[in-house]
């Protein structure tokens, strides 16, 4: 996954005349701040046999780039027919390449097929030799971009953040959600166990209540509380008695006089 990702590309004027400029509405997403601008470029492939006939129709620097979703319109000039091997090479199918680079490093390229046809001429019924003999009138040539089927190629580059990982994004807090779900399940199990224990205790109390009468229940409760209080009182009394015994023992013990040497 790249820091900059193209979300959509809309061809605004399609079909159009060969001499009309290209117009693209580009929407992309930026995940982190960028120090430099993005360089967008549109290239026209003038010949299928040699890259020397490729034409850079236009370049555009876009920046500064804020984090989030951004949209702009990229307009590029039409190809220069004087730079083509032959004028007849205008006709037929060719390719345009929309690319983006960061600090001279290309990281994405979108390719489109383009079909150029001249009015009153059916190229499908002609072979290559016949097409090369056609006297081309640029004012009658129309282009049609196959915008529905772009070919996207991505390249890994070094961004500003050296710690940025191009691997697919990990779902945030996935482990925490699993831990929370497990904790909730454990709490539910503990609650169910606690309710079961309470029910068992209530059943035991109910059995005891059934064996005795109401007066007996009240007497038992009172005795239990009195016994607890008595136990506490006995402990305090024992502590007081032990303290008094120690004090009386200290008083009864005669003082030892130090021996004197004669």
Curated annotation (Swiss-Prot):
**Which InterPro entries does this one have?**
ASF1-like (IPR006818), ASF1-like_sf (IPR036747), Hist_deposition_Asf1 (IPR017282)
GO CC annotations on file: chromatin; nucleus
Q: Does the keyword Chaperone apply?
A: yes
Q: What ranges does the record list as Acidic residues composition bias?
A: 173-219, 226-242
Q: Region Disordered: what ranges?
A: 157-262
List GO molecular-function terms, semicolon-separated. H3-H4 histone complex chaperone activity; histone binding; histone chaperone activity
- Domain of life, per the record? Eukaryota
Annotated Basic and acidic residues bias:
250-262
Asked if Cell inner membrane is a keyword of the record, the answer is no
Q: List localization entries.
A: Nucleus
| Recorded coiled-coil stretches | 173-196, 223-253
> Which UniProt keyword terms apply here?
Chaperone, Chromatin regulator, Coiled coil, Nucleus, Transcription, Transcription regulation
Q: Name one GO biological process term.
A: chromatin organization
Q: Which family does it belong to?
A: Belongs to the ASF1 family.
**Function, as annotated:** Histone chaperone that facilitates histone deposition and histone exchange and removal during nucleosome assembly and disassembly.
Q: How does it assemble?
A: Interacts with histone H3 and histone H4.
Kindly give the PANTHER family that the UniProt entry links to this protein: ANTI-SILENCING PROTEIN 1, HISTONE CHAPERONE ASF1
Protein name, per record: Histone chaperone cia1
Native organism: Schizosaccharomyces pombe (strain 972 / ATCC 24843)
The beginning of the lineage is: Eukaryota, Fungi, Dikarya, Ascomycota, Taphrinomycotina
